[in-house]
């Protein structure tokens, strides 16, 4: 959304925003976040390794940690991750066109993230396949979360938010 829309939202009392791209978020939110500490910015799109440091400096929540290379980049900037939240992206549909680890790799990858990389993993995230019932994938993610002692889920696109609220 354009900056004008963001400013209107802030004036209406909205302080939580999501962005798909680091560069677009920098253009809109770099100054806004300095002026308004209530703003919480979520990265919902894929992250390239060369954008990790600027992303950590700007965003508060990361929904798409999905591979070892990015985890290693995050780990380099651990000191900047205080009060940041990270979700591990799980490809519950095992789609070749989507990012995320496969469900059966979740436990081992979480161990790597937490023990070796020392990253604060808050939750799990999934984007269900477009032609599948999202509830099946939300259930699968919830089970993985329970098995791995994780409390938070990032689930549901706009068209499935009502179903996501059940979890």
Language model features by range: what are they?
Residues 1-151, 157-159, 167:
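Conserved alpha/beta-domain cores
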